[in-house]
């Protein structure tokens, strides 16, 4: 029986505990804070004992063992085990707010629990530097504006994607909510006609037929779709040959409700027959974002 491994890493306070809970609900045997140097030995030991699906969380608490991780991953690949690598991130400002609101100590902190902002920012930036190489090898999810249910949904979508084949992730967003840091390519479509100014279309989204019909009739919309499509078609094969597991393409309009959503749906529909494809609409759900206490419960 083949073994499925999901390796969750990322910044402290970014939501690794939420991700592990989602994987546990999906039937994974979960282990938090495994020393990186024990990864291949642990996988070999656990093979067939608990489950054929294992999720492991690693972060800066195991900073001393991180240099061993590339070798451990290569050893797993030689054994025919290719893990999903997922890196959870958030902006420094978001992480500072989460730690400050919960009054928890950052794992790299040498000071008191309620350390000053300057010291906390320094700890976060040190952690970001420590994990930089690992981030480059992983699929990145920016949790800065996500609710816990959104993050859980993203994780479950990722584990359903085939390992060893590049997956395209198309995501819409609104520039007024900030630029998503987990994107490989970002396209700005704010110059296109905006359905927001049509009263009957304002409450709808780019997934609704009246909005789609409106946009298909507007000058420049189809040209934008074809330009993005042509760019990706020109380079996707080369990206895949470079052993990329995921490519995240973000399309942004002002609010992330109409134009970007429509184009994401159109592009995903076009590429889905050839590539595993995921869709995300970051700005559509305006409900509260992840609570700091939920995010930090097991991250520090």
UniProtKB/Swiss-Prot annotation:
Instruction: Identify the InterPro entries for this entry.
Output: P-loop_NTPase (IPR027417), RapZ-like (IPR005337), RapZ-like_N (IPR053930), RapZ_C (IPR053931)
Positions with a binding annotation for GTP: 59-62
Tell me one GO molecular function of this protein.
GTP binding
Q: Which Pfam families match?
A: PapZ_C (PF22740), RapZ-like_N (PF03668)
Binding-site positions, ATP: 10-17
Query: Is this entry keyworded S-adenosyl-L-methionine?
Result: no
Keywords attached to this Swiss-Prot or TrEMBL record, sorted alphabetically, are: ATP-binding, GTP-binding, Nucleotide-binding
- Kindly indicate whether the keyword Manganese belongs to this entry: no
Q: So where does this one cross the membrane?
A: none
Q: Give the matching NCBIfam families.
A: PRK05416.1 (NF003828)
- Which PANTHER family does the UniProt record give? RNASE ADAPTER PROTEIN RAPZ
**Which HAMAP family does the record associate with it?**
RapZ_like
Function noted in UniProt = Displays ATPase and GTPase activities.
Q: Which family does it belong to?
A: Belongs to the RapZ-like family.
Q: What is this protein called?
A: Nucleotide-binding protein Daci_5422
According to its UniProt entry, this protein's organism is: Delftia acidovorans (strain DSM 14801 / SPH-1)
